[in-house]
Amino acid sequence: MSSYANHQALAGLTLGKSTDYRDTYDASLLQGVPRSLNRDPLGLKADNLPFHGTDIWTLYELSWLNAKGLPQVAVGHVELEYTSVNLIESKSFKLYLNSFNQTRFNNWDEVRQTLERDLSTCAQGKVSVALYRLDELEGQPIGHFNGTCIDDQDITIDNYEFTTDYLENATSGEKVVEETLVSHLLKSNCLITHQPDWGSIQIQYRGRQIDREKLLRYLVSFRHHNEFHEQCVERIFNDLLRFCQPEKLSVYARYTRRGGLDINPWRSNSDFVPSTTRLVRQ
């Protein structure tokens, strides 16, 4: 369990509690979680972070009424900057989106601007929002992570408790390699409810070669670990940077959706550009 699981900053969250579902607009439903809760124990300081990146959200259950009362539906794409003070707590995001359901807006741009304003206020950081009509996305192919999948290894695993021990001496040789490794076996658990979070992860790096068995064992050790998606990605980035010391590193995870939302955080210290196409489990 994370050291800050019972932190007072989490006490007021609706996550894990019985809640009422409102269908008229209410920005106060949004709740933020300080990024510092995870970053402080990792020694990460807001003014000297070793990465950049965003939290990419896809909104699949977004609906409101137009000025004449006709329901509208859209798929939303949200990007929250890594520099924001808070991350957005996902259940509160779902409840907030539900509050649009019986609310009239004059046009689509008013909806987009409202989302952008409220999310920016909650996160205390930069947020961008794009809305897509369904016919704009119909026929969009299922994406995949480019890279070499490390999952099909004939190894025995009997420990599922998080540890960085597997990354000790995980690099070999002096030759510098540049490769992209992929695993679909990432599974962690919600910090509050301990419900499972399922994801695929892409690790792109340049440096001494990382032992794939040790890397896979490390990733599997998240199986009983309780943290939010964004926190897991930053922990993985920080651990790889610390133990493997690559010249360049990018870590990108795409998680399956829950409550009509999926969260896809990435962190990088290079010119990494994430693919935003949904994966087969999304």
UniProtKB/Swiss-Prot annotation:
Residues holding NADPH: S90, K91, R258, G259
Alphabetically ordered keywords of this record: Cytoplasm, NADP, Oxidoreductase, Queuosine biosynthesis
Main location per the UniProt record: cytoplasm
Disulphide-bonded residues: none
Pfam families membership: QueF, QueF_N
Catalytic residues as annotated in Swiss-Prot or TrEMBL: C190, D197
UniProt GO molecular function: preQ1 synthase activity
GO CC annotations, alphabetized: cytoplasm
Record's catalysed reaction(s): 7-aminomethyl-7-carbaguanine + 2 NADP(+) = 7-cyano-7-deazaguanine + 2 NADPH + 3 H(+)
The EC number(s) this enzyme carries: 1.7.1.13
Family to which the UniProt record says this protein belongs: Belongs to the GTP cyclohydrolase I family. QueF type 2 subfamily.
HAMAP family: QueF_type2 (MF_00817)
PANTHER family to which the protein is assigned, alphabetical: NADPH-DEPENDENT 7-CYANO-7-DEAZAGUANINE REDUCTASE
Classification via NCBIfam families: QueF
Name under which the protein is recorded: NADPH-dependent 7-cyano-7-deazaguanine reductase
Organism of origin: Escherichia coli O45:K1 (strain S88 / ExPEC)
